[in-house]
Amino acid sequence: NITIEHSIIQNDILLNRRIEEYLSSRCGFYEIYTYPWIDEKYIHAAKIDISKSLKLATPPAPSLAYLRSSLIPGMLEAIAKNLRYYNEFKLFEKAEVYQKGDYRPSSNDEILPVQSNYLTGCIVGKNAKEIFYEAKGVIENMARYCHMENIKLEKIEKPNYADINAYLNVTKDDKIIGSLGLLSVQVMSDSKIKRTNVAIFEINSDK
């Protein structure tokens, strides 16, 4: 006999739809889509150790040789581009990231990078305190609206991109699964993000 069960994948699809609806319809975010290969300068700008990123054998361009291990670099690039036209905006992206690992889905001869689903979002505006607390509220309310398992916001470990005085970690079952913070002055400078403030968050949605 074959038993058909409602799979975890179906639940994931429903959760993703809830998150999209919540961020776009209720919070005023616009969804963006970026390529999996990232401009090297934004990897450095995000203060990510590039040695932990996967390098492509045949990149589409010399500066696009690395696969993203985080969605933050792509979001930095999107912010810099959008600031040419807008002073205030909110963006989000849901996508896979690729990390070095030893993932063998079907045979020992086939070694693939470890792939994880991440969610990132940003609020860009002049008032740093206001956008930080708005982003904090977005995450807190997302858990309730999307029927997600309880997540908490705690100050444990500063993310590399964040200002030393304005960050929080997203935790679940006492484990860090994401972060929220204002971009540091150095990260904004290296990303050519000028005359504004940015609150940004990133969550591993597989955890």
At which residue positions do the language-model features occur?
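Extended beta-strand-rich architecture
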Residues: 1-207
